[in-house]
């Protein structure tokens, strides 16, 4: 069984709503992270479609280190007061490390032969990709993304997101960072 907790009742409802939202959309491949809840979301969203499903570890959530499993507010307080290249205490990832990893995941998706890919990930990777798909750099205080909501990005937007994340990671800063 994959690691992590499965979907809550609300999560199941959200994944089923995603299935309805995607009912008329073509999907050639489904991609999830190693965590059980993303795989369950993907399976529910795809329903009975005969679509290959794969796990792409590089799409996982940021490594929270010492904050893993604790209140998200504690991680946010730390993140809002440290630069993006600061290593997260307890062996976690810096935001720049996560951005480079996510850019690599996008490259891997772009290299696949399938044209339409449904990728299920986590809050920070999704926000970073959506923002970077229009050339925007990540912010310290990310705007939350709704659970199980579809964001439609074409190949050019995904390529721009990967390039933008790498460019930001090479010279990281947060305009909204509290010193």
What are these regions (language model features)?
Residues 23-26, 109-116:
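Glycine-rich phosphate-binding loop signature in dinucleotide/nucleotide-binding domains
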Residues 5-6, 45-104, 161-164, 178:
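Phosphate-handling substructures
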Residues 44, 128-132:
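Active-site signature of alpha/beta-hydrolase-fold catalytic machinery across serine-
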Residues 32-33, 100, 120-121:
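Short beta-strand scaffold positions
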Residues 1-49, 78, 91, 96:
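Active-site-proximal alpha-helix that buttresses catalytic centers in soluble enzyme cores
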Residues 25, 55, 62-73, 131-179:
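Acidic, low-complexity terminal tails and accessory targeting/binding regions
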Residues 36, 59, 124:
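Catalytic metal-binding/acid-base residues of hydrolase active sites
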Residues 115-123:
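Generic beta-sheet signal
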């Amino acid at each position: 069984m994959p690691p992590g907790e499965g979907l809550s009742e609300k999560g199941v409802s959200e994944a089923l709503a995603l299935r309805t939202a995607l009912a008329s959309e073509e999907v050639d491949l489904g991609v999830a992270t190693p965590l059980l809840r993303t795989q369950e979301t993907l399976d529910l969203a795809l329903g009975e479609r005969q679509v290959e499903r794969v796990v792409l570890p590089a799409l996982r959530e940021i490594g929270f280190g010492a904050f893993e499993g604790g209140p998200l507010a504690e991680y946010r307080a730390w993140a809002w007061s440290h630069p993006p290249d600061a290593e997260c205490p307890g062996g976690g990832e810096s935001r720049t490390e996560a951005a480079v990893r996510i850019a690599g995941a996008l490259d891997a998706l772009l290299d696949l032969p399938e044209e339409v890919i449904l990728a299920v990930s986590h809050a920070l990777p999704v926000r970073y990709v959506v923002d970077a798909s229009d050339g925007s750099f990540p912010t310290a205080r990310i705007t939350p993304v709704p659970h199980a909501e579809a964001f439609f990005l074409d190949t050019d937007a995904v390529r721009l997101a990967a390039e933008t994340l790498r460019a930001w990671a090479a010279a990281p800063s947060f305009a909204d960072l509290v010193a």
